[in-house]
């Protein structure tokens, strides 16, 4: 009986450890892998239009279990006339350079944050701020077309702001290995099958890439994914 209990204890311990180390990536993980400084909430109204419009194309992105190359291009990002915390978005997507599909949607503000200490050795000028903002997003493709669905998730973007000016897009942590910005972490759900797949993209890196990105200082897709639209990175 004692041996049986010991065996069950060992089995339970292995199962627990496996569960602990196999937790799915979360948006909090995305924040931790992007931000290299302490921060706190920043309760202020910010006009994020210039920040969000700074980068509209040339994101790295993937979709599905095979990490097929996903390209996202924004053609229009503007403020909602009805809600100051919502930005109306238009653009198009393609997968492995095929199936170009237009979408419309929104970025909805969640929170602003500011860094509590300078990100460089040199202190900021009086009144200047560095920080980031988080948004939820939903991008809806044309349901009348084949192979279409809805992109949905959360996003963060880094910015800097001089005193009495609007924030601007900023690569604050450009000196770090694995630098990244404008990180979209989410899913795509097919209208037809209702199946949901991972679909994420970003500047310089893709959030929660797991074994996909082998690079340290640079973005390098693993060889087993080259056939899914990443041939240009073949080495």
Give names to the regions the model predicted.
Residues 1-27:
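Bacterial Sec-dependent N-terminal signal peptides
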């Amino acid at each position: 009986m004692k041996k049986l209990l010991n065996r069950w204890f060992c089995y339970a311990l292995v199962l627990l450890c496996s569960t602990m180390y196999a937790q799915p990536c979360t948006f909090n993980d995305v924040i931790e892998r992007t931000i290299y400084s302490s921060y706190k909430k920043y309760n202020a109204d910010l006009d994020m239009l210039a920040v969000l419009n700074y980068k509209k194309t040339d994101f790295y992105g993937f979709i599905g279990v095979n990490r097929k190359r996903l390209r996202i291009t924004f053609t229009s990002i503007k403020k909602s006339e009805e809600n100051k915390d919502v930005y109306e978005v238009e653009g198009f997507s393609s997968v492995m350079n095929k199936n170009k599909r237009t979408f419309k949607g929104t970025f909805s503000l969640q929170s602003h944050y500011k860094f509590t200490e300078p990100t460089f050795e040199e202190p900021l000028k009086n009144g200047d701020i560095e920080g980031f903002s988080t948004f939820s997003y939903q991008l809806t493709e044309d349901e009348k077309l084949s192979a279409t669905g809805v992109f949905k998730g959360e996003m963060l973007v880094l910015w800097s702001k001089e005193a009495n000016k609007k924030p601007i897009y900023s690569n604050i942590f450009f000196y770090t290995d694995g630098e990244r910005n404008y990180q979209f972490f989410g899913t795509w759900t097919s209208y037809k099958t209702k199946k949901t797949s991972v679909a994420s993209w970003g500047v310089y890196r893709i959030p929660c890439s797991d074994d996909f990105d082998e690079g340290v200082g640079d973005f390098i897709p693993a060889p087993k994914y080259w056939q899914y639209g990443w041939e240009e990175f073949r080495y």
